[in-house]
């Protein structure tokens, strides 16, 4: 079940309005694990997984002056999902925090958890209908961070014991047929994780089966 509401003035690189969603999902299915390198001590496992997932997200933009807009966002997620056979499988199936287009197309274990809180702020300088400069800073805090033991099994760490952040600055040129975006961003983990990129056109992501 999902409830969505939006008054944004653009699907991407919006500067006015807000977007809000509340999603509740129930999943059930079978999980099968086959070792990649079978040994005498390894074995195939089959488990049934059932879990509840509830998420809420809202972001909004407020016009402070004709040339300056201040945006913000908040996101919360809770999932009762159990651990998978090993740490890698657990992290692959954990929910991710991906507020930027770049973060949506990359895999980063530091920004994944079964329960988390996140928030961000987005100062935007709007020069005209064509050009804008966006700066974004986000904080991500797992309620229970997922860790790995010596046997490559997942376990929960101490509550609220980890904090991650990411920041991005981008220059946007809006054209009738698409947008040109040049960006640089930084993730707190892995260390020294910097990225520079250029995108042409629109990056519009469809709804996922597991939100």
PLM features: what roles do these ranges have?
Residues 158-185:
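C-terminal structured domain segments
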Residues 1-128, 135:
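C-terminal outer-membrane beta-barrel translocator/porin domains of Gram-negative envelope proteins
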Residues 27-29, 142, 176:
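Short connector loops/turns at beta-strand edges and beta->alpha or beta->beta junctions
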Residues 2-14, 127-132, 146-148, 161, ...:
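Outer-membrane beta-barrel initiation region
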């Amino acid at each position: 079940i999902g409830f969505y509401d939006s008054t944004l003035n653009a699907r991407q690189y919006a500067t006015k309005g807000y977007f809000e969603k509340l999603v509740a999902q129930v999943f059930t299915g079978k999980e099968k694990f086959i070792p990649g390198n079978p040994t005498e001590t390894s074995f195939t496992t089959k488990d049934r997984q059932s879990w509840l997932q509830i998420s809420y997200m809202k972001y909004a933009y407020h016009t402070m002056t004709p040339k300056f807009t201040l945006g913000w966002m908040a996101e919360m997620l809770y999932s009762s999902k159990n651990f998978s056979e090993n740490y890698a499988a657990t992290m692959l199936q954990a929910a991710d925090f991906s507020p930027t287009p770049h973060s949506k197309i990359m895999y980063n274990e530091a920004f994944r958890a079964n329960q988390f809180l996140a928030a961000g702020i987005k100062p935007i300088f709007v020069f005209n209908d064509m050009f804008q400069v966006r700066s974004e800073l986000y904080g991500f805090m797992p309620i229970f961070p997922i860790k790995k033991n010596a046997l490559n099994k997942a376990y929960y760490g101490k509550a609220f014991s980890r904090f991650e952040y990411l920041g991005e600055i981008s220059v946007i040129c809006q054209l009738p047929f698409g947008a040109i975006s040049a960006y640089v961003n930084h993730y707190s983990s892995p260390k020294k994780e910097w990225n520079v990129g250029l995108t042409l056109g629109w990056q519009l992501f469809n709804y996922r089966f597991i939100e």
